[in-house]
Amino acid sequence: MNQPLQHTTVLLDEAVHALLGDGDAPAGTFVDGTFGRGGHSRLILQRLGPQGRLVAFDKDTEAIQAAARITDARFSIRHQGFSHLGELPAASVSGVLLDLGVSSPQIDDPQRGFSFRFDGPLDMRMDTTRGQSVAEWLADAEAAQIAEVIRDYGEERFAGPIAKAIVARRTERGPISSTAELADIVAGAVKTREPGQNPATRTFQALRIFINAELEELQQALEGSLRVLRPGGRLVVISFHSLEDRIVKQFIAQHSKEVYDRRAPFAPPQPMRLKALERIKPSTDEVAANARARSAVMRVAERTEVPA
């Protein structure tokens, strides 16, 4: 039987250094947008000054339970997705950290339904207290809808055949309720396999992203960060696949240049609101020690003096 993996935080030191800067014991309010199991939050608290404050967000009830064990008065957590960080007071935050990866305890718990490696209920919700599970959505979705999700969020070229196979199995045997059943359907529909990759990888990724509205939440969080970051505040984002990184890259690029209004060619341009600082990949040593770091990309930007 596969044993659950202990979660190892990716780019831990690099992310916290980028967030807090070089100063000793910084003050100010910082945001950890994805508490997970607290890897980043605990290190931030170690390096934060006595007047500092850390606000964490997470949708996962198990993460909220883990956070309850932190008794530091400088720390608080909200049972919300990071898309809500824009509700914090404007220009009140010195740094925002978004780690977009799914934690190992989530992936490796069969009852959460995130992985094709373990047979369990086909759920995949980050917050199991609300919303549809993947099984519930697949029970009613049309083939065209399923194909669109798998193609757009998984970049899967066999999205059409996979969707047809899902609907055919559902029609023949009833709703698809387990991860093993879905993985078996996908394996039968994918005609060629990428070396070293399970044929269900892209489909599971796509359904997880869709059911949790991950890309929409990311866009909202990035927009919210512009509102809450004070001038000089840092935005640090760790992404794990090309769809996420593309959104982050484009967002930083969009706000790192002056914007002219074509309808008013003589009006002064809107000044840039972010300054791109770094793009960091895990070291070869980190990837060797933690295979899940392989696809990680960290981008760092700094809020300019211009108000939101």
From Swiss-Prot:
InterPro entries the record matches: RsmH (IPR002903), SAM-dep_MeTrfase_MraW_recog (IPR023397), SAM-dependent_MTases_sf (IPR029063)
Protein family membership: Belongs to the methyltransferase superfamily. RsmH family.
Reaction catalysed by this enzyme: cytidine(1402) in 16S rRNA + S-adenosyl-L-methionine = N(4)-methylcytidine(1402) in 16S rRNA + S-adenosyl-L-homocysteine + H(+)
Residues engaged in binding S-adenosyl-L-methionine: G38, G39, H40, D58, F82, D99, Q106
GO cellular component, one term: cytoplasm
The protein's Enzyme Commission number: 2.1.1.199
Source organism of this protein record: Acidovorax ebreus (strain TPSY) (Diaphorobacter sp. (strain TPSY))
Cellular localisation: Cytoplasm
Name this protein carries in UniProt: Ribosomal RNA small subunit methyltransferase H
Job of this protein: Specifically methylates the N4 position of cytidine in position 1402 (C1402) of 16S rRNA.
Keywords of this entry: Cytoplasm, Methyltransferase, rRNA processing, S-adenosyl-L-methionine, Transferase
Pfam families noted in UniProt: Methyltransf_5
A GO molecular function held by the record: rRNA (cytosine-N4-)-methyltransferase activity
Matches recorded under SUPFAM superfamilies: Putative methyltransferase TM0872, insert domain, S-adenosyl-L-methionine-dependent methyltransferases
GO biological process: rRNA base methylation
